[in-house]
């Protein structure tokens, strides 16, 4: 089963075009840093290592995601085999049978988060096993620290993994809440274990804090302020989240859990740590879903533990039935993927996002049409810039306001260097040339087509940086760099270019 799913992911990693987010992370690896605009740096570090070893091919960049289910499965086995080798094996098998572990080969910020979260939980599970054995055998006795001497290394290792998860994505905070709930409600006498975990995770937190202090607090401005300004409660979002979780966990698993709900409840009480890490983050996402659409990939860092809970609670004679149901569920997905694989690009021309498909699949041809010697290529959005830049093998800056997502160019691109040059700004939609005229001596519209899809480029001659700074960068500052007065800003390269200070007046 592991080899079959691995083969499927390898095939998809080579067959699927690069997405905008993946291309963005590729550029993170090209401009290596210890932090990036949207998120902490781990996926950029991973891709930098992959590039050094295997090069820039799409399949190589996706290799961490391709291997991810094997790493998570190993963590599950290592953590719960001491409880029951057969049940741990069932947990790994059920997890591996889920369609997401056959069909997901995309590299995202969640990829390292999922791995490090799984190993953080595995290490604390082992720590608790050792600690409870130490207490039971009177090594130090109840209330003494003999258990900490016996299990301290595992608690520390869990903290290190939590730190690595923190440097992957801030959603690890939900795992932190789950662990805190466990120690508060079920393991209060071993609270020093939690303290040791926190201490070992703190260096990663300090590293990220320093990066934010010296890089405009972009992680905080993006994740806390800019992306949530217009959030309003909607029951539809809650319903979408519930439906997504029903699909992800699968009707098969949920039906089995309902049929054996008494066993689920008893197992949840006996395995309190597992219950907390499996359920608390998903419940917290449920609470957030009223004001925020929860992405499917967001929950995958906590999703594996649901299958451990299922494997431990179901009667042994019911596990083969669960396996058969999941095989059928998986087969439906594989047949759908096989059917899609038989189609060609023109057959999708009536799909709403056909333009994005063309851009992803034909990026090299688009670049070839627009590129001319002596002209700088840009785009009006991060997704297009990242994908087309990957195809061109040169960084393609974003021109204009862009969106609140992925504003990495604010930190690394100095538009002053393009003063006096001719630019071509590639766009998916037909532009209004009046929006570009203030920044050039002259502008003209160039029209192209690729696989029946029109796209455009605005050619501007003799770029005027001062006008761009006053017209575009000042508005970007007003929208995305309104730091709260209480937030200390040590350095901000964007503001330094705009006004010569760490923060600029809006």
Protein language model regions, located:
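Specific aromatic-rich, kink-prone transmembrane helix
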Residues: 30, 73-75, 94, 112-133, ...
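Membrane-proximal, lumen/periplasm-facing interface regions of secretory-pathway glyco-
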Residues: 296, 322-373, 382-406, 425-504
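Membrane-interface alpha helices of multi-pass inner-membrane proteins
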Residues: 31, 151-169, 180-181, 285
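Transmembrane-helix motifs of polytopic, lipid-linked glycan transferases
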Residues: 63-85, 119, 123
